[in-house]
């Protein structure tokens, strides 16, 4: 009942109100020219007016409530990702105190983390990371030797939008008389091998020319990012932690190598010839995958429209794609990244470092101002946990954007097991970038790849850890 829900509601351990004299709390957030009109742009910090759009209006009302309660003004400045790192450096080194909260893009942020530009969020007054409005997976993944320079929070839907998932075309699945895909997920049977089987069954060379073209129906529409997504779907990560809360490069166990080799078979299906009936299974693996990063003039929009126009059974995506796809005609469902094997405990969904940023607080904030910003962030996060996040998941993703109740259940699975791998964030020794090229290059010799990178990766982890420890001491 509603009363029980109210009783169970966790409240922030901060005063319910304060008077900061209409002081401005200014957020600096990365942007990307060309992305301004898409959902990849941050839409969760401020809203100018009530428009009738669910996320916008929830953000507007959230801010109004917190601004009234604490007598502050929440403001936003967007800056292109090509400029924001320099601006943050100048801000901190110049001690100008312009910005109170910063969101550089996650892919570009590690160099800033190592320069002592940001407070350890664990030490900011009034912020309680044990509360559910701070993402515990992000806290665990990003903290190194106790230092947490950035965090994912309920204030934002942007990092949820950056979560990997898979869409499937229901019409193609029905025409190919495939088994019920939702049931596979619910029964824990949605695996790499099952993806391969279904994709092979759905692939059609419509024009009969024997070659893969966008005129045909692919089993899986993807890009180079798929290799990262599939690997992390296995529940494994490149980087884990030791007893001192330090990063350790643990990628390369026998099971992990097997996982990657399977991923390669999937990613590389476009790049091989099919010559003989005796290689039917291999042929199917080779034929049904499209890597849009290796085909000329295929940007993200073109790639998405291929799926919307019925040219693929499966479509690798981030959740931000769902908002764009709802305008199309395709009857699609949403499912998590497949498991490596049925016995795996859960489905895991990677968060893309390329399309999100996480919250940091610059070390230029001190004393009363730091305490004020901590309180406002805690209040915003708590309020968002009960308003913005439910609105995002229940209304925007489930009701507005998904076409059926079953996709709604899948979204809970996707959101509840999100993976932040430190390797994807820090890219130690360029490993993450090189790994993403393995699929394109059809390199299945994973052991040699690891061996060639191990020394440099270990060296860069050590260097990064020392820099983060020094940054924590300074911050």
Residues covered by each model-derived region:
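Gram-positive cell-envelope targeting signals
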Residues: 1-13, 27, 66, 98-104, ...
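Short, solvent-exposed loop/beta-turn-alpha elements that line the ligand-binding surface or hinge
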Residues: 126-134, 185, 237-258, 342-349
């Amino acid at each position: 009942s509603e009363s029980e829900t109210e009783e169970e509601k966790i409240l922030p351990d901060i005063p319910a109100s304060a008077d900061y004299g209409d002081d401005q709390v200014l957020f600096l957030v990365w942007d990307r020219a060309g992305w301004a009109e898409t959902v990849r742009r941050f839409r969760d910090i401020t809203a100018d007016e009530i428009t009738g759009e669910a996320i916008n209006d929830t953000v507007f009302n959230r801010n109004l409530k917190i601004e009234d309660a604490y007598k502050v003004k929440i403001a936003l400045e967007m800056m292109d990702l090509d400029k924001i790192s320099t601006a943050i450096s100048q801000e901190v080194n110049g001690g100008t105190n312009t910005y109170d909260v910063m969101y550089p893009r996650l892919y570009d942020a590690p160099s800033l983390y190592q320069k002592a530009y940001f407070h350890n969020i664990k030490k900011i007054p009034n912020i309680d990371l044990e509360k559910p409005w701070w993402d515990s997976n992000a806290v665990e993944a990003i903290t190194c030797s106790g230092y947490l320079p950035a965090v994912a929070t309920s204030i934002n839907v942007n990092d949820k939008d950056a979560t990997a998932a898979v869409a499937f075309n229901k019409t193609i699945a029905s025409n190919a008389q495939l088994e019920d895909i939702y049931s596979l997920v619910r029964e824990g049977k949605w695996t790499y091998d099952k993806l391969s089987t279904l994709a092979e069954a759905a692939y059609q060379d419509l024009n009969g020319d024997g070659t893969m073209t966008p005129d045909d129906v692919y089993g899986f529409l993807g890009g180079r990012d798929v290799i990262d997504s599939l690997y992390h779907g296995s529940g494994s990560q490149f980087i884990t932690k030791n007893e001192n809360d330090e990063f350790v490069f643990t990628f390369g166990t026998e099971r992990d190598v097997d996982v990657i080799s399977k991923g390669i078979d999937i990613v590389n299906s476009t790049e091989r010839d099919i010559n003989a009936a005796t290689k039917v299974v291999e042929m199917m693996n080779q034929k049904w995958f499209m890597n849009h990063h290796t085909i000329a003039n295929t940007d993200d929009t073109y790639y998405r429209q291929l799926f919307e126009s019925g040219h693929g059974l499966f479509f690798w995506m981030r959740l931000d794609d769902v908002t764009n796809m709802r305008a199309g005609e395709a009857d699609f469902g949403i499912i998590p990244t497949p498991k490596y094997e049925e016995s795996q405990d859960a489905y895991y969904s990677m968060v893309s470092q390329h399309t999100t940023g996480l919250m940091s607080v610059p070390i230029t904030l001190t004393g009363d101002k730091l305490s004020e910003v901590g309180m406002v962030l805690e209040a915003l996060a708590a309020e968002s946990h009960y308003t913005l996040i439910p609105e995002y998941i229940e209304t925007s993703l489930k009701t507005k954007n998904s076409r059926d109740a079953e996709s709604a259940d899948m979204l809970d699975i996707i959101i509840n097991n999100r993976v932040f791998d430190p390797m994807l964030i820090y890219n130690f020794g360029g490993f993450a970038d090189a790994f993403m090229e393995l699929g394109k290059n059809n390199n299945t010799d994973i052991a040699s790849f690891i061996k060639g990178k191990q020394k440099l990766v270990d060296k860069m982890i050590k260097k990064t850890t020392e820099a983060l420890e020094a940054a924590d001491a300074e911050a």
